[in-house]
Amino acid sequence: MPTNSIVTIRYGPYDSCGIVDHRTFRLDGLQAVLKGDGHRYVLEKTDDWNTVELIVNGERVYTCNITDLVFGGDGRLDPLCQEAIDAVREAY
């Protein structure tokens, strides 16, 4: 996939301390990895609980549980962020 492509990050609400809400703290690493690889991204809220989906050219290329992502990390040590960036690179 060429750099400077737009990746849509769809994320749903998740439960934290008994409160269900859309939060982006767990997406920090994913955003950093995408930006570091030269991609632009758009955050899009969805009603599906606990989900993260990466959409490239209208096609879902990666999905995972948002609570499995490392909280507030830079994405370098998070294996899910590495899987996600590999999926974006392989998208056409």
Swiss-Prot record:
It comes from the Eukaryota. Belongs to the UPF0728 family. This is UPF0728 protein C10orf53 homolog. It comes from Danio rerio.
